[in-house]
Every structure is written in C-alpha cells, then in structure tokens.
Amino acid sequence: MVTIRADEIRNIIRERIEQYNREVKILNKGTVLQVGDAIARIHGLYEVMAGELVEFEEGTIGIALNLESNNVGVVLMGDGLMIKEGSSVKATGRIAQIPVGEAYLGRVINAQANPIDGRGKISSSAFRLIEASAPGIISRRSIYEPLQTGLIAIDSMIPIGRGQRELIIGDRQTGKTAVATDTIINQQGQNVICVYVAIGQKASSVAQVVTTLQERGAMEYTIVVAETADSPATLQYLAPYTGAALAEYFMYSERHTLIIYDDLSKQAQAYRQMSLLLRRPPGREAYPGDVFYLHSRLLERAAKLSSKLGEGSMTALPIVETQSGDVSAYIPTNVISITDGQIFLSVDLFNAGIRPAINVGISVSRVGSAAQIKAMKKVAGKLKLELAQFAELEAFAQFASDLDKTSQNQLARGQRLRELLKQSQSAPLTVAEQIMTIYTGINGYLDSLPLGQVRKFLIELCTYLKTNKPRFQEILSSTKTFTEEAEDLLKEAIRDQMDRFLLKEQAEINF
C-alpha cells in the first residue's frame, strides 16, 4: 500500500504556484455582420488599423479598408464562400507584404506572390510591404540614361529614360501590349529586370504574352504578375502594388528595373467596384474621390535613385485604355498628369497599316533628349519636325489639285520617313540600326526608291553594314557619338548598297 506524504504534495503545489505565470492575452476580435460580393461588414475589431490584414474563422484573409463608427468594412482576398454571419474574425496586426527575391525571375505569380505556373514553390527569405512609400526628393537624381525600347518611333522622338514614367495610351486593339512586350524583349543583355503586371485580362492573353517572352528568351529576366478577369476585385486592385514591390527590391539592390502595368483602367474599375460596395460616395464617372491617389502613389514609386543609394532605377510603363480615342476621360487625364509623358496609339494609323500605330504629333516625353545618347540626338533632331510638316502638307494636299515641285518632294520624303518608322512585332532594332535607318531617310537617300522598296532596302543595308562595316557599330557602342568616321562609313555603305540594290532590281525586271 502506497503511503501519501503530505509534505511532498505541499512542496509540489508550492513549486507549481511559484512557476505560474499569469499572462492575459487580449485578441482584437470581431464578428461578421454581413458578407457578400467579396465584402464583409465586421462588428468589433476596435483597434484595427486601416489597411490591416484580418483573418476569418475559415482561413480567408481580408483587408480592413473602411473604419466606421459601428463596423469595419473588409474586402476579401478570396471568394469567401465559407464565411458565415456570426463567425469570428481576428486582426493580425500586419499590413500586406510579399516575399521577394531572385527566385521570382522567370516565374508567373498572382497578387499574393504565389506561383501560378505549375512549377512548384518559390523559396525566399526577404519580404517587402505591398504598399511602400515612394523615394523622397533627396533620394532621387535626374534621369540621364536611356532605356531603349527597340522601336525607332519611340527611341528617336519620344525617348524614355531609366527611372521615367511613360504612359502608353490608346483604344483597345491598337498594339499597346505589343509595344510593352517589345520593350521587354529589347532589354536582353542590358542588365534590366522586367516585371509585367497583367490586370483583369483574359487568361489566354496573358498566356500568349508569356509564350512570346519564353520564345524570345526574355522570361529569364522577367517576372509576370497576373490577376485575370475572373479574379476578385481586391486582387486585381492589389496586383500593381505587388509588381511594384518586386521591382523595388531590385531597384534598392542597385539594379535597373522596368515595370509594365497592363492596364490601369482595369485596376481603377476594380477599385470603383470595391468602393461602391463599401458604400463610399461616388464622384466623377462613379469613381471614388481618391482614385487619383490610387495611381499617384503607385507611379511615384518609379524613380532613378541617387548615387548614395546605388543609382538603381525603376522605369514604369503604365497602360491605359481609352474609349473611341477620348483622352479627356477621368482615368486617362489623371494618369497623363502623373506621368512624364505619353505614347498615344491611334486606331486610324493602325488600320492604315502603320504599326506600331504611334501618333507622333500628340505623343511626348517630358524627359526628352536627356534620355538619348549623343549620336541619336544628332541624327534624330529634325525627324519630328519633318514628320509634323509632312502631316500638315498631306492634309492640305487632299484639297489641292496641283502642287509645286518642292511640296511634291516634301510629300515624297515624308512618306518614306513614315515608312521607315514601321516595324514588325517582336523585331526590336539596336541603336546602331536605328541611327542608320533615320540617317538614310532624313538625308534623302531613300527619295529615289519606290515606296514599296524602302523597307526591303533598309533590311539589306542593315545586313550589309553589319557584315562589311563592323567598325560603325564599334564606334557607336564605345563613344555613344556619331563621329565623322562613323558618318563616312555609313555614307559609303549606303552608296555601295544603293548601287547593288538598284542593279539587282533592274536585273529582276529584265528577267
């Protein structure tokens, strides 16, 4: 029989009492009052912060956006089909953040930085807030390096610099995404990390872009953030900020980044949907009053950092869709006023077979020639003026029955200049090829050729110059200037190729 020793029991109880730590844990909890349309109204959560993540009983995450006197309006980052009225919600004490790092290169992810390309998990130890403050004035420096798009019309007349925000605007089906993807393809070998953000697009369109980038070897340095048309409005609204956080990671690591938002009209529509469901007062075109801030805080994150911070850069190319060419609508005017210029794509030019369909007359870069190398500045200086004069004369020529010889020559020159701006999709040109093309057109070497032969001649001239005059490329690459030697080499190549081309054409006619 076991004897019970009272002193032993007393010692054990005393020991336990001494070890007892009375810790009171207060949880910031609430109860679901109403749920539907990816919006939940919560009673409680008295100490929740604006933008704080909240977690529902069944695991769905939401963001507290509306802090009202008697309830909290939460937008859901999922369908929320299992959330019931009366179920509990707890505040997490965290603001939305995502993992970032080199491992994301070449991957397709969603707004929560989860992979959606079926290639397994992405491991990363670094994190960045989705909503981060833009660099201040002291943290920036003026833009001075060009970001080459590979498109003659842009690089010569609407130059983009590293750290700039340049809007691509136009109606649907005018080639906005094509301009953006061509720019990504042209960054190959330029040590630029690209982030492509697809907002509210068809899954097939996103897949097409990814396939194009893979075929051209551009996915190696590109991250695709995609929230398709069937995604909740909350995730479509967050996707651009996720892309910006990823690009910022590389920018602050002293690297150069390019981010494309395709497109911000759909993000604004998703935000409008959320705001109306949260019963926020509607303003112009039913958008909420802070829709300008929605885009300004996103686009201000693009910057060219100061030398103290490593001179990294983040160049933003936001895309905005217009209706029937109306650039005076609410979202287009907002984004135009935030950005450092716009590239306007025209339906009429697109239908006339001028692609990329860039309307040079109303497109502008507010950084200008600061984002061009000296060689391009020297050669392309007159191009925009000549095209503007040609457009004016062409409009007049429709009504005039007979024109003098000078006007006829100017029209012929203008038509050839317009022809040399045409480019096939996914066929970007190097700076040397662009300078060669513009110089040939501006100096009248193409005037004697029939209009239909211009592109053929330029392609052959480009091949001839690469093969027989490699020194031309070397001079431009090393000095970035259009020296007398480079000009002499180019003139010689044009003369040689013109003779060969005309002989060849004559032989074909005779045959």
Curated annotation (Swiss-Prot):
Which Pfam families did the record assign? ATP-synt_ab (PF00006), ATP-synt_ab_C (PF00306), ATP-synt_ab_N (PF02874)
Catalytic reactions on record: ATP + H2O + 4 H(+)(in) = ADP + phosphate + 5 H(+)(out)
Task: Classify the protein's membrane topology as the record does.
Answer: Peripheral membrane protein
The Swiss-Prot or TrEMBL record annotates one GO molecular function as: proton-transporting ATP synthase activity, rotational mechanism
- Family in the record: Belongs to the ATPase alpha/beta chains family.
UniProt xrefs under HAMAP family: ATP_synth_alpha_bact (MF_01346)
What the protein does comes down to: Produces ATP from ADP in the presence of a proton gradient across the membrane. The alpha chain is a regulatory subunit.
Provide the protein name: ATP synthase subunit alpha, plastid
Q: Which organism is it from?
A: Cuscuta reflexa (Southern Asian dodder)
Could you tell me the gene encoding this protein?
Answer: atpA
